[in-house]
């Protein structure tokens, strides 16, 4: 597929009419695969390419989407991908890397950080790490340096204070917590940077699969906290990446 510059050069040389050029440019924005209409123009519009949501898609469908995207951009990120599904598609994508804790797949080399600033990913407990790793892998794939600060929840708050220099040095802080979700408010009261809070479904009984943590974060008294959906490490990292690269 010709690039935009190549198409414009053909028009300038009289080898292609403006109408034909416009048609080629429009056609190059998507890839119709029958089961998916892949957005090839998203990176130009939004700054980051389309990310594949692996849940609910077959291995064959994911391979097709990756192959379409790879014509335009690398690296390519797939989220919510089980180990079993990765094993099924790996023969077709031998260079793919599986991040087991995050349940993410990347194709293509991770880019160097685009800015000197970094994103801190902070968790309350070890059980929150799958969501944290989804956030960290997403942020790294989008060209950000990530500092991981794990297992520093309020049950042993001295652990948090020992890492405050790292957290305060970040341009954006992602705080991930289940149970009652108090860590986001604590961090929000200690830093002068944007805090993106991610409630997780870690907990039982009246944690209500993360609803309690979500409501705690939404009702935080600490200013400067933004809250995303339960277990949405990807969404937090996407927003944090936009802030870090402004």
From Swiss-Prot:
InterPro entries: P2CMN_synthase_LarB, PurE_dom
Record's protein name: Pyridinium-3,5-biscarboxylic acid mononucleotide synthase
Cofactor(s) essential for the protein: Mg(2+)
Primary localisation category: membrane
The gene coding this protein: larB
Entry's localization field: Cell membrane
Membrane topology, from the record: Multi-pass membrane protein
Catalysed reaction equations from the record: deamido-NAD(+) + hydrogencarbonate = pyridinium-3,5-dicarboxylate mononucleotide + AMP + 2 H(+)
Keywords: Cell membrane, Magnesium, Membrane, Transferase, Transmembrane, Transmembrane helix
Record's keyword annotation contains Cell membrane: yes
Induction of synthesis: Induced by L-lactate and repressed by D-lactate. Is thus regulated by the L-lactate/D-lactate ratio. Makes part of the lar operon (larABCDE).
Organism field: Lactiplantibacillus plantarum (strain ATCC BAA-793 / NCIMB 8826 / WCFS1)
Transmembrane domains' residue ranges: 172-192, 206-228
Molecular function (Gene Ontology), one example: transferase activity
Function: Involved in the biosynthesis of a nickel-pincer cofactor ((SCS)Ni(II) pincer complex). Carboxylates the pyridinium ring of nicotinic acid adenine dinucleotide (NaAD) and cleaves the phosphoanhydride bond to release AMP and generate pyridinium-3,5-biscarboxylic acid mononucleotide (P2CMN). LarB can hydrolyze NaAD directly or it first forms an adduct with NaAD that releases AMP and reacts with bicarbonate/CO2 to generate P2CMN. Is required for the activation of the lactate racemase LarA. May also be involved in the activation of other nickel-pincer cofactor-dependent enzymes.
EC number: 2.5.1.143
A Pfam family recorded for this sequence: AIRC
GO BP annotation list: 'de novo' IMP biosynthetic process
GO terms under cellular component: plasma membrane
Phenotype of the disrupted gene, per the record: Deletion of this gene leads to a loss of lactate racemase activity.
């Amino acid at each position: 597929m010709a690039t935009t510059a190549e198409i414009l050069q053909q028009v300038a040389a009289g080898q292609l009419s403006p109408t034909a050029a416009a048609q080629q440019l429009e056609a190059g924005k998507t890839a119709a695969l029958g089961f998916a209409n892949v957005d090839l123009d998203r990176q130009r519009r939004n700054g980051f390419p389309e990310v594949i949501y692996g849940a609910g898609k077959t291995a064959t469908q994911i391979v097709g989407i990756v192959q379409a995207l790879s014509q335009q951009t690398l690296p390519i990120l797939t989220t919510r991908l089980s180990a079993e599904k990765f094993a099924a598609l790996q023969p077709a994508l031998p260079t793919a890397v599986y991040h087991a804790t995050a349940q993410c797949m990347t194709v293509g080399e991770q880019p160097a950080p685009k800015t000197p600033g970094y994103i801190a990913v902070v968790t309350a407990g070890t059980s929150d790490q799958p969501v944290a790793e989804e956030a960290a892998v997403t942020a790294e794939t989008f060209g950000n340096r990530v500092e991981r600060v794990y297992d520093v929840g309020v049950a042993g708050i001295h652990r948090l204070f020992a890492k405050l220099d790292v957290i305060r040095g970040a341009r954006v802080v992602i705080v991930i917590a289940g149970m009652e979700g108090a860590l986001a408010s604590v961090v929000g009261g200690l830093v002068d940077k944007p805090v993106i809070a991610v409630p997780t479904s870690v907990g039982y009984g009246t944690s209500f699969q993360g609803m309690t943590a979500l409501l705690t974060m939404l009702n935080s008294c600490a200013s400067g906290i933004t809250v995303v959906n339960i277990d949405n490490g990807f969404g937090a990292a996407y927003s944090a990446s936009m802030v870090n690269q402004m």
